[in-house]
């Protein structure tokens, strides 16, 4: 397992030079495709495959061979792999440990309610905030997650449990407002009609209270619920 982990981390270093294609909006993907000499309609085809959980460009059956070759040389598809899964014997709550392309890991939790399924996702690997009641901060901070890696936690959980998640809570590892730009982009992607289509009013963002970023978030009028921890430093 240690050898596999090292191989994944080496691959992650190489991937840093490639485009994280699943963190793109449809408009961004359209620009990416057309600027490299391919027809505009190809972007929607690629985008549809990404949200059908396809993780290999070769599996995109209606994409031309030359476009596949270009995508393989320029891009990668972020994947959240299940490293560990724990299921509560009391209420069937499921806790996941996910790993990403570079071998870094985060935790997510899926909870079942009468109204449907909710997932608590992570936004960073580790955390800088140092809240005394939180175990995450004690492990230090590694990096922030890309929008695609936040999406991946939801998609992998849905596929594994064969469910449709209807509510999202950004209350896992990390401080969402310390990863502001990526979190906002994730919110736009996850609520898009072309993506997972989970409405903003079904999303809660929990913060330890980074006040300037709270004001900045409010100006965007996203319609999400903001939860502020009263026990943060």
Annotate each predicted stretch with a short phrase.
Residues 1-2, 9:
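Basic polycationic patches enriched in arginine
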Residues 104-223:
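Conserved Radical SAM active-site core
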Residues 7-117:
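Flexible, acidic/Gly-rich N-terminal and inter-domain linker regions that tether
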